[in-house]
């Protein structure tokens, strides 16, 4: 039997042609320390900052400290099964979360995994949680209003699309209520909302989700929650994950509102991680880069240039103060990063002025350019009037006799405070806000007793809906104040037939 060498060589060639290289080079390290949501590993010399690393039990971590001898890793999720000596390997990917339309209406955790029991989220799009903020030339000036539906904000501290407006105040002063009401008011406004709950009790988040469902707001909202029972890394990455979800829509030319509730808890979790990773502590034991932690997050909110699609992301970060101290480290940091702040005072809140906005300490640095023209006209001096009223009110407590002009100022001030009060979850459309503020600033409310102001307002809105819907439509469509003679005539017609509580009581008797 003779073996033909040609056949053998052709067979070998065929085999070589069909050969597939299944070898994959992996960089694997060894865990040297594990505990408190932190791991240290050696042997990962080429790991990138914020790279996703996988442990042998399937858990993931993120490289946060890149040191000479080892890597400091924050563990995302359960770390009970990880032991010293376990293997950890590089994935070559930066930490990413799922994004896209499929996320809308869902409640997810910091990794984008659903926690609402409604099954898997069908999306194949992802975005890195850390992303470079748009540069100067990629942005555009804030020019479109973002209506919150709250008279006190839309009149005194207006917000524009693409702005960063801080909501700051002590605990239990209505910070979350303002954020939720703003989300509720975005219905039919072509906005997508992202609510990031950081360190909020699960029962509280459940209540917020139920509120959003009740008013139909979950149709355009993503809720991201990192509860207090979760490890610190989950709380730390939550706002960045939320920003990534919002950016997906912004870079596709859509408008996004994102609420970070609240960044004080995120700062605390980052301080915890930094101390565990042996980073040198600074003021109030926060690490040296705590300012950068918040600035790189909030700079991602922007109004993009027309070249990039003209989308926007408006950020409402929330900060909790201790005993009204806005000069503490984190509050001053975030105040200096944002384009203004809404300061809520507990004294006002307990006195029944809700939303409890301190007009003197609250400011919007860029929102005035975006304010509706009609609102600008009727609310132009409102902030100054309110601030001077507060001063006068303090002065009159000494019991001195007042001249007629001062008395008139006080009366107008008290009515202003009453008009700016608003029940929770009842946002008002801008045209109705303009009507009541016009009535206030033009003296139509001066003869009305304070206890009847709310009823006067509600009945005035009903009157306009029935008899002057064209004026409301004009404000809504054009943003301009209609003919003042027509407006005055309608308000006078209503005020002439309005009966005060005393008149109603007398009529009954």
Curated annotation (Swiss-Prot):
The record marks 362 as: Required for activity. It comes from Lacticaseibacillus paracasei (strain ATCC 334 / BCRC 17002 / CCUG 31169 / CIP 107868 / KCTC 3260 / NRRL B-441). SUPFAM superfamilies: C-terminal domain of alpha and beta subunits of F1 ATP synthase, N-terminal domain of alpha and beta subunits of F1 ATP synthase, P-loop containing nucleoside triphosphate hydrolases. This is ATP synthase subunit alpha. One of its GO terms (molecular function) is ATP binding. It is an enzyme of class 7 (translocase). HAMAP family: ATP_synth_alpha_bact. It is a peripheral membrane protein. Pfam families: ATP-synt_ab, ATP-synt_ab_C, ATP-synt_ab_N. It is found in: Cell membrane. It catalyses: ATP + H2O + 4 H(+)(in) = ADP + phosphate + 5 H(+)(out). Keywords: ATP synthesis, ATP-binding, Cell membrane, CF(1), Hydrogen ion transport, Ion transport, Membrane, Nucleotide-binding, Translocase, Transport. Produces ATP from ADP in the presence of a proton gradient across the membrane. The alpha chain is a regulatory subunit. GO terms for cellular component: plasma membrane; proton-transporting ATP synthase complex. F-type ATPases have 2 components, CF(1) - the catalytic core - and CF(0) - the membrane proton channel. CF(1) has five subunits: alpha(3), beta(3), gamma(1), delta(1), epsilon(1). CF(0) has three main subunits: a(1), b(2) and c(9-12). The alpha and beta chains form an alternating ring which encloses part of the gamma chain. CF(1) is attached to CF(0) by a central stalk formed by the gamma and epsilon chains, while a peripheral stalk is formed by the delta and b chains. Its main location: membrane. Belongs to the ATPase alpha/beta chains family. ATP binds at residues 169-176. Its EC number is 7.1.2.2.
